[in-house]
């Protein structure tokens, strides 16, 4: 099973790339994390938030089109479901049992287009706080690693 993080944004600071890479490399080969970046759309007087989200959604859809048809889509959204670490670990186990890859969608500054959120099988949120988009990549990778460590009784997670 592959975990694909599809994130709007590119040219992240080095510390973001380092943090993401650190957790991605800790994952076992059978549960690899891959990052696919999508170019953000610039907001202007002729590009309102809805237009920006639609254009970014088209780019995200292009990435999703390159993935398996059975790929499960999970959208990160401020109104998504809260998961505890143990709940995320259980969900990860369920996804592994069901087979297929999982794509996690991280929107741009204006969020994800409503059509993408509707297409997702699950909406989750990492925090009630507003987080920088680059940091969300690092936090998601860390939480996926932590969830995996729970399933393996690895000492990384001590709760």
Swiss-Prot record:
It holds the Pfam family SPOUT_MTase. CDD domains: RlmH-like. InterPro entries: Alpha/beta_knot_MTases, RlmH-like, tRNA_m1G_MTases_N. Its EC number is 2.1.1.177. Keywords: Cytoplasm, Methyltransferase, rRNA processing, S-adenosyl-L-methionine, Transferase. One of its GO terms (molecular function) is rRNA (pseudouridine-N3-)-methyltransferase activity. S-adenosyl-L-methionine binds at residues 76, 107, 126-131. Homodimer. NCBIfam families: PRK00103.1-4, tRNA_RlmH_YbeA. Belongs to the RNA methyltransferase RlmH family. HAMAP family: 23SrRNA_methyltr_H (MF_00658). PANTHER family: METHYLTRANSFERASE, RIBOSOMAL RNA LARGE SUBUNIT METHYLTRANSFERASE H. This is Ribosomal RNA large subunit methyltransferase H. The gene is rlmH.
């Amino acid at each position: 099973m592959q975990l694909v993080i599809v994130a709007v944004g590119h040219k992240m600071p080095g510390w973001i790339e380092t943090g993401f890479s650190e957790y991605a490399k800790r994952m076992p080969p059978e549960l690899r994390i891959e990052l696919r970046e999508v170019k953000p759309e610039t907001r202007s007087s002729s590009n309102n938030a809805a237009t920006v989200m639609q254009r970014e959604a088209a780019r995200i859809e292009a990435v999703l089109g390159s993935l398996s048809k059975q790929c499960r889509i999970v959208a990160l959204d401020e109104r998504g479901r809260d998961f505890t670490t143990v709940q995320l670990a259980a969900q990860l186990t369920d996804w592994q049992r069901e087979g297929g890859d999982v794509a996690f969608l991280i929107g741009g500054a204006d969020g994800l287009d409503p059509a993408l959120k509707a297409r997702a099988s699950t909406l989750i949120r990492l925090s009630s706080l507003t987080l920088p988009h680059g940091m969300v990549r690092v936090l998601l990778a860390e939480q996926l690693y932590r969830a995996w460590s729970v399933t393996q009784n690895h000492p990384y997670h001590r709760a």
